[in-house]
């Protein structure tokens, strides 16, 4: 993997860890369904991990169609991430132990041994992120300038990155 690809993956991980809350989108027949999910980890390979109830609607949907989208948004910093990938349920006591947090007892009262608990691992295929480094005042000025001039406002190309994931090592 090139240095640039490593830097992009690192920046993507930083954004996800900072934002933390994702909207996980799954397919339900002809409809798309989204729900908020707290990210537990972005591992060294770029896989994204979540805790879930094994018998929830989302896990049933993933069993039928593993293609998901994860959307992260932080309006305060103008940071946005969209990830397309393949989701799967993972039953790994060691991984559960590694990722476990006491707050999870609210959803899994039996703790780490809760029989209804599963992990969802999302292996990204592609991702895009927008991370505007300009302050809101600078952006507002540029937007106002575009309106006055009758031109379209365009963010700089460096603020929009598209990363194709390579998980074949």
Residue map of PLM features:
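N-terminal leader/targeting segments and the immediate start of mature chains
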Residues: 1-20, 157-158, 165-169
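Short His-Asn-centered micro-motif
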Residues: 51-53
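A short, Trp-centered hydrophobic/proline-enriched beta-strand micro-motif
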Residues: 14-29, 68-72
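C-terminal edge-of-domain segments
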Residues: 115-169
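Short, structured beta-strand-loop surface elements
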Residues: 61-126
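Short active-site oxyanion
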Residues: 45-49
């Amino acid at each position: 993997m090139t240095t640039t690809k490593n830097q992009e993956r690192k920046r993507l991980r930083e954004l996800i860890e900072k934002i933390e809350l994702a909207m996980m989108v799954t397919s339900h027949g002809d409809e798309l369904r989204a729900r908020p999910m707290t990210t537990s980890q972005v591992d060294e390979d770029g896989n994204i991990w979540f805790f879930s109830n094994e018998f929830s609607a989302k896990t049933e949907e993933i069993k039928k169609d593993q293609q998901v989208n994860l959307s992260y948004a932080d309006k305060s910093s103008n940071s946005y991430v969209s990830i397309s990938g393949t989701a799967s349920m993972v039953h790994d006591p060691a991984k559960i132990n590694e990722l476990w947090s006491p707050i999870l007892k609210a959803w899994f009262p039996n703790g780490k041994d809760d029989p209804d608990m599963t992990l969802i691992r999302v292996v990204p295929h592609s991702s895009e992120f927008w991370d505007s480094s300009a302050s809101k005042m600078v952006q507002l000025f540029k937007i106002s300038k575009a309106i006055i001039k009758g031109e379209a406002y365009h963010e700089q190309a460096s603020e929009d990155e598209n990363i194709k994931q390579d998980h074949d090592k």
